[in-house]
Amino acid sequence: MNEDRKNRESGKLLYCSFCGKSQHEVRKLIAGPAVFVCDECVELCNDIIREDLQGSEAGGVEGLPKPKEMKAILDQYVIGQDKAKRILSVAVYNHYKRLKARTFRNDVELAKSNVLLIGPTGSGKTLLAETLARVLDVPFTIADATTLTEAGYVGEDVENIIQKLLLACDYDVEKAEQGIVYIDEIDKISRKADSPSITRDVSGEGVQQALLKLMEGTVASVPPQGGRKHPQQEFLQVNTANILFICGGAFAGLDKTIRSRSERSGIGFSAEVKSKEENTNVGEILAGVEAEDLIRYGLIPEFIGRLPVVATLEELDEAALVRILIEPKNALVKQYARLFEMEGCELEILPEALGAIARRAMERKTGARGLRTIIEHALLDTMYELPSAEDVGKVVVDAKVIRGETEPHRVYRSVERQRVSA
């Protein structure tokens, strides 16, 4: 600045070092060490930087898998549930588009869209959330709603959910603030009665109240490295405004609530008469769920308002369970075949056995989650003896093995051993 003053006092004309304009052609000329820059060049530089930042953020959106691409990846791991996959893909894409495509304009603020998954046990709720997190390469954690209680009571505080998310990304706060949290068994924190209770419900309505701000967006104080809270401790501050919450639950009995509402709305001369056998598919009934049904089930209106996107999953039939056994990338049959291959043996599960496994899972009402248990039980003795057995080239499983009527058939490499076993 002293040099600028000297130049002015000496009557020397000054020029911008970038555009070459004189001090009389611009509003302001800023002096640096042996250089000058005018206000017009400063404004131009700001515009270039702003456009570059917007372009890089737009490029981030381009880097996101599009909804169709997300669904295609989900199809590789989860069988069926097309409608739920579409809803989830769009919701997750819009959520991360909201984060990555932030502009400098403040005229429209995009709200967060958390997701509620409703479906029977073993229909793929958790697997959908896990696969999405893997596709997007973001921190992911699963929380069990049944262990949560209000602060000050025995059980886990809701802040523990964020602590688990931090643990999943080595306590990188910036990464955690863009993660996904899946809260399982969310139906188990429903209010114990339709009307508010005069007694304190610390594991039901109380937990719903505690989750409200966390899901909407707040700054949660989390003890570093999983320590317990005490007054002299420094806390990690985690903003949950950009964390996507996906809540899932079986909501047993919700179909009856929906059916009773539908029957009430159809009273009168214009009511359509339906037989009791009609519309017995639980998945079809759940697809018609409304906020009123969830409130009657025990969720408070404020909590439902934090979950604007609702996806329902269908009950898996026998054909879908058979496909789950053989089609996904990590299908159970492929997993067990790999285990047997590591012992130098081939595993063949016949189509009739696949059908028997699916039927047994349906009888137990465990969905896809029960398939592994059935296969494990059928192959337990074989897997126990196989590492010590010699010359076993192949193990064949048929429907009788699944029903427990016989042992898996062993095929030996040598003809003599085969005759002995026969």
Swiss-Prot record:
Subunit architecture: Component of the ClpX-ClpP complex. Forms a hexameric ring that, in the presence of ATP, binds to fourteen ClpP subunits assembled into a disk-like structure with a central cavity, resembling the structure of eukaryotic proteasomes.
Family per record: Belongs to the ClpX chaperone family.
Cross-referenced SUPFAM superfamilies: Glucocorticoid receptor-like (DNA-binding domain), P-loop containing nucleoside triphosphate hydrolases
CC per GO annotation: HslUV protease complex
GO molecular function, one term: protein dimerization activity
Classification via HAMAP family: ClpX (MF_00175)
Domain ClpX-type ZB, residue spans: 4-57
Annotated binding of Zn(2+), by residue: C16, C19, C38, C41
Gene: clpX1
UniProt entry keywords in alphabetical sequence: ATP-binding, Chaperone, Metal-binding, Nucleotide-binding, Zinc
GO biological process, one term: cell division
Function: ATP-dependent specificity component of the Clp protease. It directs the protease to specific substrates. Can perform chaperone functions in the absence of ClpP.
Binding sites annotated in the UniProt record for ATP: P120, T121, G122, S123, G124, K125, T126, L127
InterPro entries (UniProt xref): AAA+_ATPase (IPR003593), ATP-dep_Clp_protease_ClpX (IPR050052), ATPase_AAA_core (IPR003959), Clp_ATPase_C (IPR019489), Clp_protease_ATP-bd_su_ClpX (IPR004487), ClpX_bact (IPR046425), P-loop_NTPase (IPR027417), Znf_CppX_C4 (IPR010603)
Protein name: ATP-dependent Clp protease ATP-binding subunit ClpX 1
Membrane-spanning residues: none
Entry superkingdom: Bacteria
